[in-house]
A protein has these predicted regions:
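Active-site-proximal specificity loops/subdomain of glycosyltransferases
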Residues: 1-15
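Generic surface-pattern signal
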Residues: 10, 77-80, 84, 155, ...
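C-terminal catalytic/acceptor-binding lobe
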Residues: 92, 98, 103-206
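Conserved catalytic core of nucleotide-sugar-dependent glycosyltransferases
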Residues: 17, 25-106, 118
Length: 206
């Protein structure tokens, strides 16, 4: 991840925002633009789906994450100044996104948790309750938020979600909220997943 952000800054040094995603990630670009419009690109921002390994908090790479230009410059400069130390740490680690997150922290760039907008899985596997079966905080109810990204998406899922988003954009105001139509699509996918894997979904009323 660190070589990637280093190369990205040198090849595209004048962007306001940098969006990093994996091959099986999916981004709803229309809602990403709305999300970015709520942030200040002149500030050092590193945001995504929160993950934790040991004491290191970081943005999950598969869920995609965003970095402002000031934040990217800070972390690249820090990486250049501490390259040997960071690469030694990397050699003993298994998660490149965690190494990147630790480097942001060490460089003085705080992590911003962008969950539930950035999701760790695809719609049919989005959890409605926590692992202990207690309901999520009402302010963080998954179906009351606007999605930006998903992970573990197959090629067929990506195509279906892309078609859904483009159809929605064609039929609606570009700046309106995807939420109601998204629910229909997501609930359909959730039902498919239940049939496919024989699972039950514990969903709060919409």
């Amino acid at each position: 991840f660190l070589p990637m952000v280093n190369k990205t800054l040198h090849e595209r040094p004048d962007m306001k925002w940098y969006v990093f995603m994996e091959a099986d990630s999916f981004i709803l670009w229309s809602t990403l633009q709305q999300y970015l419009a709520t942030l200040d690109p002149t500030k050092a921002i590193y945001a995504g789906k929160q993950m934790l390994i040991a004491n290191d908090m970081f943005a999950h790479g598969g869920s995609a994450f965003i970095v402002s230009r000031p934040a990217l410059r800070i972390v690249v400069d820090y990486y250049s100044a501490h390259k040997a130390e960071i690469e030694k740490f990397t050699d003993g680690h298994w998660a490149g996104d965690c190494v990147l997150g630790k480097t942001f922290t060490d460089a003085g760039v705080p992590f911003t948790n962008a969950w539930p907008a950035f999701q760790v899985d695809y719609p049919g596997l989005v959890q409605y309750t926590r692992a202990d079966a207690r309901p999520n905080n009402q302010k963080l109810r998954l179906w009351c938020g606007t999605p930006v990204s998903y992970h573990h998406m197959s090629a067929a899922m990506v195509e279906e979600m892309w078609d859904f988003e483009q159809d929605w954009i064609d039929r609606n105001d570009p700046v309106s909220n995807l939420r109601s139509q998204y629910r229909k699509c997501s609930l359909t996918e959730s039902q498919r997943s239940q049939r496919r894997y024989g699972t039950k979904t514990f969903s709060p009323p919409l």
